Structure formats: C-alpha cells, structure tokens
C-alpha cells in the first residue's frame, strides 16, 4: 500500500471513529478523553484537592477531564513536547520530558510537594521501525516511573500507556516493585488494533 493510500485509509477510519465523533460532539479536545474517563469510572483515582502531573498531555484530552475531578483547590501540571491550548487551572510546560532542562522546569513547579497521581499518555515520535519505536516507548515509560518513584505521596498512584511488545513485561515487573496493586487495563475507547494498554498502579510503597 502506498503512503498516500495508507494516509487516506487512516483519515477515513479516524473521521468515522465513534469516539472521534463523540469527542467532537461533546467539545472534547481528543478521543483520549474517553480513555481517562473510563479509567476514572472504574478506578476512582482522582478526587478533590489532589495534585496530579500529566505527562504527554497535548492536546489536553486528559487534563481537561482530570481538572474537573480535582477542582479549583487541586493542582495539575501538564507537560508535552507539543503546544497545548490553555486549560483553566492547569499549569503547562512545553518541552521534551527526557531533557534535563525540561525536567528541571517540572521540578521547579512541583516545588518539593508530594504528588498524588502521575499520569502518562506519552508515546515517542514513530519512525516505522518497530524495534526502535518500542525501545523509545519503554525508555519514556521508565522516565515516567522514575519521576513517580521520586515524587509520589505514599499510597499515591501512577497511570501510563504501555505498548505490548519487547520490554513491556519487564517494565510491569518494575512497576510492581514500587506499587502494591498493579492492573493492566485496555479501555473500550482504545482502538481494537492497537497494542496499547494502560498500567494502573496504586498504593505506592514510598
């Protein structure tokens, strides 16, 4: 299949996708909003006054939902390499999470406060090389877990998108070392063909 044909196929599937249509109808920033809503409905992670950090936040599908749960007295920091239009109550950092400069900016905003929940929908820019792309994905996941391990409150929680493949089982073992409860969850709003699932980790051991 030519690149042009595959692009047309993706566009057709995207524009006819139920969750894309619903997101547009409801004014959500992306279909990803439904994933975090499903996670919240099932696991009740977000509560008023919580401090949450959203990694890989753009275009804001997760942040716009989470801020509703944590309320005006909660704190939400969102970070992404791409631009994100402002969301009331959300502090945004644009930068590469893997860079020291961006990591320092995030730490400055965190200001030694303990975080209640770290959520990550990060994914690398795909090159088409599955082995390389998977390795980059695992690297970002490890960075997110390291950040959570350093900054979470005891009994805090961690949510991250994982692509099933080389290194994913080993990654789950690392998560289990830090949390008492670790669950693999594939939302209904995840595309059926996608290898993605979400790790829901609660009761951080501290």
Curated annotation (Swiss-Prot):
S-adenosyl-L-methionine binds at residues 60, 62, 80, 96, 121. One of its GO terms (molecular function) is rRNA (uridine-2'-O-)-methyltransferase activity. It comes from Francisella tularensis subsp. tularensis (strain SCHU S4 / Schu 4). One of its GO terms (cellular component) is cytoplasm. Its main location: cytoplasm. The keyword Kinase does not apply. It comes from the Bacteria. It is found in: Cytoplasm. Belongs to the class I-like SAM-binding methyltransferase superfamily. RNA methyltransferase RlmE family. It is an enzyme of class 2 (transferase). This is Ribosomal RNA large subunit methyltransferase E. Disulfide bonds: none annotated. Specifically methylates the uridine in position 2552 of 23S rRNA at the 2'-O position of the ribose in the fully assembled 50S ribosomal subunit. Its EC number is 2.1.1.166.
